[in-house]
C-alpha cells in the first residue's frame, strides 16, 4: 500500500512529515513541470525531504512527497546541490564520512527517472604545494561552492587545516579543457578575502593574513571547531560578499567585500540581516532561493551545529521574504517555522506510544520528547475513523522509555523499560507493583558500537498473526523487531517489517521510536514513527490531526494527589478550575471509578481496587497521574 503524503503550506497541512531541526536546502525540478522544487536535508538524522512546488506567482505552496526518496544517494552531515557541469541538472556535493572531505554525485537523470552517479570518492582533491591533496571539509564546516572568478566553473571556499583562514580552491576546468564538466582544482589563495577568525570567539579580523598581526593566534591550540561559509553579492556592486557563522554562536556575520574583481578584500562586518538579525542556536547556515515564486531570491536559515542538543527544535527554519531585488535585497522575517507550521513537531525527539489516555474506548497517542515532556494526541474521532487533537499535559518523566503489556498473560500488566545503554529491563506486575525479572531482557542490545556507546532503546509490544513481537527504536535510527519467547535471547525478525508495512524505509532519523496498533479498526496495523527531528510519520493509513495548536495546557503543579501509594482514600487537589469528572482507570484504559468534581479537593474511595498501578484522569484527559494502590 503506497500513500503520497501531501503537505500544502499555508493552505492545508500534513502533520506526519517527521519534524525538522537542523536543515540545509536545495532546488531541483523533480516532476519536470518547469518549476524548481524544494529539497530539505536535516542533518540530525540525515533525512532528505522532498517538497513539490505548486505555487503560482507570488504564492507559497510546497507539498511533501516520498515519491523521489529512493532515487537519492545516502547523504551525511551536509550537502550542496549545485550544477557543476552546466547541463541544467543540479549535482550533489556532500560530506565524505571518515575522510574529512567531500564526495560528488553527478546528476544523470532523464525525463523517465531521477538518477545520480558517484563520480568523486572518497574525497575531492586540489593541487596544493606540489601534490594532489584532500580539500579539507569536516562534518562541522559548510563550504561555499560557487563561481568566484566569473569563468563559469565552480570554485570552492573552505576553512584550512589550521582553521583560521579561508582557502580558495580554483576550478581549472575552463582553463585546461574549455568545458565545465571536470573537477580539477588548485589551491590559489590561503587567505581569501584577507580575513581571519579569532581563536577566542567569533570575531573576524579584517585586512590581515599574517599570524600575530592584529590577531591572537595560538598555533598549538586552534579554537576553530566549525563554521558555515556562504558568498553572494548583497549590495549590488558586483563583488561577492561573505556570510559566516561560527559554532556555539547564534548569528550570521556579513563581511562586505571592498576589493575588486581580481582580489577579495573584506572591509566591513555587521549582523545579518540588518532588519532582524538571525538568532538561531547554533551556527546557522543561509540559503538564498525564490520561495514565493516572485522571481526574487528569498532567504532560508537553519542551524548547522553537528551536536543534536545544540539546535532549536521547533522554530528552526527561518524564512525571510525579499521585499527588494536580487541586486539590492531587503530581507524581512516572515516566519520562524517555515514548513514546520503544518506538521507535528515536538522539538527534539518524538517517542510515541499507543494508549487509551482518557478511557473513552478510543486509542490515543502519547508522545514523549527527548527532554521527557509528554504530549497527547487525543482521539476525537471514531473507532473506524480516528482523528487526533493535540493536548499538552506537561508531565515530566525520567529518560526511560517504557511500555506496559501483559507479557506472561496472567491478567496483570508487566513493564518493559528501555534505557540510554540500549538494552531492556523486564518487570512483572504482581498486584503490589512490579518485580524486576531481567535487566537484559531477551539479550536485546541496539547499540551501534562503530558510532556510539549508547543505544537509547525505546520498546513497544504488539501482536502480529498470533505472535507477540517486540519493536525497539534506537539511537542509530533503526527499528529492530524481535519475536518474544521463553528463550534467553530473542530472535531478531526485522525482515517482517516488509510484510507488516512494505512502504516503510529501513532507517529513520536518529533516536527513532515507534508505536504499532490498529488505529482505525480495519484489521491492518498502523505504524507511527518518531525521531529526533521531533515529528511523527504515519504508515499504512492517513489520519487527520484536527488542531496542530495546543488546545489547552496544564502546568505540572496544577493537580496534586496524595497519598501515593494509597490504601483507601485518594485526595485529588485541583489548583485551578476544571470541569467534568475525575476518572480512575486501569492501564488497559478501563474506567473503574468515575466521580463528579464538587470542590477544589475531591476524595476518592479506592479501597475496593485490586493492588496495582492505576491512571487518574482529570478534565477529559487534559491531565493525568499515575498512582499505586497498596
Where are these regions (language model features)?
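Short proline/glycine-enriched turn/loop motifs at strand-loop junctions of beta-rich domains
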Residues: 575-580, 621
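Residue-level detector of functionally pivotal "anchor" positions at catalytic/ligand-binding pockets or at interdomain
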Residues: 541-562, 568
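Short strand-edge motifs at loop-to-beta-strand transitions and within beta-strands
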Residues: 602-604
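Surface-exposed loops/turns
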Residues: 567, 610-611
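C-terminal tail/sorting-segment detector
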Residues: 611-630
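Short, glycine-anchored, charge-dense loop/turn motifs used at functional sites
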Residues: 585-592, 614
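Short beta-strand segments within Ig-like beta-sandwich modules, predominantly Fibronectin type-III
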Residues: 594-599
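Beta-propeller-forming repeat regions
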Residues: 1-550, 630
Amino acid at each position: 500500500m503506497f500513500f503520497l503524503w501531501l503537505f500544502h503550506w499555508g493552505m492545508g497541512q500534513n502533520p506526519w512529515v517527521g519534524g525538522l531541526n537542523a536543515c540545509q536546502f536545495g532546488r531541483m525540478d523533480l516532476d519536470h513541470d518547469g518549476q524548481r522544487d524544494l529539497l530539505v536535508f536535516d542533518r540530525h538524522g540525515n533525512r532528505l525531504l522532498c517538497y513539490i512546488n505548486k505555487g503560482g506567482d507570488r504564492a507559497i505552496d510546497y507539498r511533501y512527497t516520498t515519491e523521489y526518496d529512493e532515487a537519492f544517494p545516502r547523504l551525511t552531515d551536509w550537502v550542496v546541490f549545485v550544477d557543476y557541469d552546466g547541463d541544467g541538472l543540479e549535482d550533489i556535493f556532500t560530506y565524505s564520512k571518515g575522510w574529512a572531505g567531500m564526495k560528488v554525485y553527478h546528476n544523470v537523470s532523464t525525463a523517465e527517472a531521477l538518477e545520480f552517479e558517484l563520480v568523486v570518492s572518497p574525497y575531492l582533491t586540489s593541487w596544493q604545494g606540489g601534490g594532489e591533496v584532500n580539500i579539507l571539509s569536516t562534518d562541522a564546516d559548510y563550504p561555499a561552492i560557487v563561481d568566484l572568478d566569473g569563468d563559469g566553473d565552480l570554485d570552492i571556499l573552505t576553512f584550512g587545516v589550521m582553521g583560521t583562514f579561508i582557502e580558495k580552491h580554483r576550478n581549472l576546468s575552463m582553463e585546461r579543457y574549455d568545458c565545465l564538466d571536470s573537477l580539477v582544482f588548485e589551491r590559489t589563495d590561503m587567505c581569501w578575502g584577507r580575513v581571519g577568525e579569532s581563536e577566542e570567539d567569533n570575531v573576524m579580523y579584517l585586512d590581515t593574513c599574517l599570524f600575530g598581526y592584529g590577531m591572537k593566534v595560538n598555533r598549538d591550540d586552534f579554537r576553530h571547531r566549525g563554521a558555515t561559509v556562504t558568498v553572494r553579492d548583497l549590495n549590488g556592486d558586483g563583488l561577492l560578499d561573505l556570510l559566516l557563522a561560527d559554532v556555539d554562536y547564534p548569528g550570521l556575520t556579513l563581511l562586505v567585500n571592498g576589493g575588486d574583481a581580481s582580489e577579495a578584500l573584506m572591509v566591513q562586518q555587521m549582523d545579518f540581516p540588518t532588519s532582524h538579525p538571525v538568532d538561531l542556536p547554533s551556527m546557522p547556515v543561509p540559503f538564498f532561493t525564490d520561495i514565493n515564486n516572485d522571481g526574487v531570491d528569498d532567504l532560508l536559515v537553519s542551524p548547522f551545529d553537528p551536536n543534536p542538543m545544540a539546535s532549536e527544535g521547533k522554530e528552526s527554519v527561518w524564512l525571510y521574504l525579499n521585499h527588494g531585488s536580487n541586486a539590492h535585497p531587503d530581507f524581512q522575517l516572515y516566519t520562524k517555522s517555515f514548513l514546520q507550521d503544518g506538521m507535528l513537531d515536538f522539538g527534539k525527539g518524538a517517542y510515541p506510544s499507543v494508549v487509551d489516555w482518557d478511557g473513552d474506548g478510543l486509542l490515543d497517542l502519547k508522545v514523549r520528547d527527548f527532554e521527557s515532556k509528554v504530549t497527547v494526541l487525543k482521539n476525537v474521532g471514531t473507532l473506524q475513523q480516528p482523528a487526533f487533537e493535540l493536548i499538552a499535559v506537561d508531565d515530566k518523566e525520567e529518560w526511560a522509555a517504557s511500555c506496559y503489556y501483559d507479557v506472561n498473560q496472567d491478567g496483570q500488566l508487566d513493564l518493559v523499560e528501555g534505557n540510554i545503554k540500549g538494552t531492556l529491563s523486564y518487570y512483572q506486575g504482581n498486584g503490589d507493583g512490579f518485580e524486576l525479572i531481567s535487566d537484559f531482557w531477551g539479550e536485546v542490545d541496539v547499540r551501534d558500537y562503530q558510532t556510539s556507546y549508547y543505544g537509547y532503546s525505546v520498546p513497544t509490544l504488539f501482536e502480529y498473526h498470533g505472535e507477540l513481537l517486540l519493536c525497539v527504536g534506537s539511537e542509530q535510527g533503526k527499528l529492530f523487531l524481535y519475536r518474544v519467547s521463553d528463550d534467553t535471547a530473542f530472535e531478531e525478525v526485522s525482515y517482517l517489517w516488509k510484510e507488516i508495512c512494505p512502504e516503510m524505509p529501513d532507517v529513520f532519523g536518529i533516536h527513532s521510536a515507534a508505536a504499532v496498533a490498529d488505529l482505525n479498526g480495519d484489521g491492518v496495523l498502523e505504524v507511527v514513527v518518531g525521531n529526533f527531528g521531533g515529528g511523527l510519520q504515519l504508515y499504512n493509513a492517513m489520519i487527520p490531526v484536527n488542531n496542530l495548536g495546543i488546545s489547552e495546557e496544564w502546568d505540572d503543579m496544577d493537580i496534586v494527589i496524595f497519598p501515593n501509594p494509597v490504601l483507601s482514600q485518594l485526595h485529588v487537589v485541583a489548583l485551578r478550575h476544571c470541569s467534568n469528572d475525575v476518572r480512575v482507570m486501569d492501564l488497559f484504559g478501563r474506567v473503574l471509578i468515575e466521580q463528579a468534581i464538587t470542590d477544589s479537593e475531591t476524595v476518592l474511595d479506592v479501597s475496593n481496587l485490586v493492588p496495582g498501578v492505576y491512571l487518574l484522569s482529570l478534565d477529559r484527559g487534559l491531565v493525568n497521574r499515575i498512582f499505586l494502590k497498596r
